[in-house]
Amino acid sequence: MIRYSSRNRSAREVPVRRHPIFQVQHWKTSNEHSYHYSLCITFRSNPRTLTFSKITVKNDGRNFSQKFFFSFLLKSFLRWINCSLPFEIWRRSKSISTHLR
Protein backbone atom coordinates (compact mmCIF):
# COMPACT_ATOMS: atom_id res chain seq x y z
CA MET A 1 0.00 0.00 0.00
CA ILE A 2 1.38 3.38 -1.00
CA ARG A 3 0.50 6.73 0.51
CA TYR A 4 1.28 9.87 -1.41
CA SER A 5 2.50 13.01 0.30
CA SER A 6 0.38 16.10 -0.35
CA ARG A 7 3.24 18.51 0.39
CA ASN A 8 5.24 17.54 -2.65
CA ARG A 9 3.48 17.55 -6.00
CA SER A 10 5.89 14.96 -7.34
CA ALA A 11 3.90 12.43 -5.31
CA ARG A 12 6.71 10.90 -3.33
CA GLU A 13 6.03 7.39 -2.14
CA VAL A 14 5.77 7.24 1.63
CA PRO A 15 5.71 3.72 3.10
CA VAL A 16 2.75 3.07 5.35
CA ARG A 17 3.44 1.48 8.71
CA ARG A 18 2.54 -2.15 8.77
CA HIS A 19 0.71 -3.57 11.72
CA PRO A 20 3.09 -5.30 14.12
CA ILE A 21 3.37 -9.05 13.79
CA PHE A 22 4.66 -11.41 16.43
CA GLN A 23 4.84 -15.17 16.70
CA VAL A 24 4.16 -17.57 19.53
CA GLN A 25 5.98 -20.86 19.11
CA HIS A 26 5.32 -24.00 21.09
CA TRP A 27 7.28 -27.25 20.99
CA LYS A 28 5.82 -30.58 22.01
CA THR A 29 7.99 -33.68 22.10
CA SER A 30 6.75 -37.17 22.85
CA ASN A 31 8.17 -40.65 22.49
CA GLU A 32 6.63 -41.22 19.06
CA HIS A 33 6.37 -37.83 17.39
CA SER A 34 7.86 -34.38 17.55
CA TYR A 35 5.56 -31.49 16.74
CA HIS A 36 6.41 -27.88 16.06
CA TYR A 37 3.58 -25.39 16.34
CA SER A 38 4.05 -21.90 14.99
CA LEU A 39 1.23 -19.47 15.72
CA CYS A 40 1.33 -16.14 13.92
CA ILE A 41 -0.71 -13.33 15.41
CA THR A 42 -1.27 -10.00 13.69
CA PHE A 43 -2.71 -6.73 14.90
CA ARG A 44 -5.44 -5.06 12.91
CA SER A 45 -6.16 -1.35 12.82
CA ASN A 46 -7.71 -1.61 16.26
CA PRO A 47 -4.79 -2.18 18.65
CA ARG A 48 -7.07 -3.87 21.19
CA THR A 49 -8.07 -6.57 18.74
CA LEU A 50 -5.94 -9.54 17.75
CA THR A 51 -6.35 -11.64 14.64
CA PHE A 52 -5.01 -15.14 14.20
CA SER A 53 -3.69 -15.39 10.68
CA LYS A 54 -1.89 -18.70 10.28
CA ILE A 55 -0.96 -21.87 12.13
CA THR A 56 1.88 -24.00 10.80
CA VAL A 57 2.44 -27.51 12.13
CA LYS A 58 5.55 -29.50 11.32
CA ASN A 59 5.43 -33.22 11.99
CA ASP A 60 8.10 -35.75 10.99
CA GLY A 61 9.40 -33.67 8.12
CA ARG A 62 5.93 -33.09 6.68
CA ASN A 63 4.39 -29.73 7.36
CA PHE A 64 1.00 -28.28 6.61
CA SER A 65 -0.55 -24.90 7.18
CA GLN A 66 -4.08 -23.95 8.06
CA LYS A 67 -5.16 -20.35 7.67
CA PHE A 68 -8.12 -19.01 9.56
CA PHE A 69 -9.26 -15.64 10.77
CA PHE A 70 -10.99 -14.65 13.96
CA SER A 71 -10.47 -11.83 16.37
CA PHE A 72 -11.13 -11.01 19.98
CA LEU A 73 -10.04 -8.48 22.53
CA LEU A 74 -6.50 -8.42 23.82
CA LYS A 75 -7.68 -9.02 27.38
CA SER A 76 -9.44 -12.19 26.29
CA PHE A 77 -6.28 -13.35 24.54
CA LEU A 78 -4.13 -12.81 27.62
CA ARG A 79 -6.70 -14.59 29.77
CA TRP A 80 -6.74 -17.46 27.26
CA ILE A 81 -2.95 -17.77 27.38
CA ASN A 82 -2.90 -17.73 31.18
CA CYS A 83 -5.59 -20.41 31.39
CA SER A 84 -3.65 -22.57 28.88
CA LEU A 85 -6.80 -23.64 27.11
CA PRO A 86 -6.23 -26.20 24.36
CA PHE A 87 -6.92 -25.56 20.73
CA GLU A 88 -7.38 -28.24 18.12
CA ILE A 89 -5.96 -28.58 14.64
CA TRP A 90 -7.65 -31.19 12.50
CA ARG A 91 -6.03 -32.85 9.53
CA ARG A 92 -8.14 -35.53 7.91
CA SER A 93 -9.13 -37.86 10.75
CA LYS A 94 -6.28 -36.97 13.08
CA SER A 95 -6.52 -34.25 15.70
CA ILE A 96 -3.52 -32.69 17.35
CA SER A 97 -3.93 -30.96 20.68
CA THR A 98 -1.57 -28.50 22.24
CA HIS A 99 -1.56 -25.97 25.02
CA LEU A 100 -0.09 -22.51 24.82
CA ARG A 101 1.74 -21.72 28.02
UniProtKB/Swiss-Prot annotation:
Name the UniProt record assigns to this protein: Putative uncharacterized protein YLR366W
Domain of life: Eukaryota
Species of the source: Saccharomyces cerevisiae (strain ATCC 204508 / S288c)
Origin organism lineage: Eukaryota, Fungi, Dikarya, Ascomycota, Saccharomycotina
Note: Almost completely overlaps YLR364C-A.
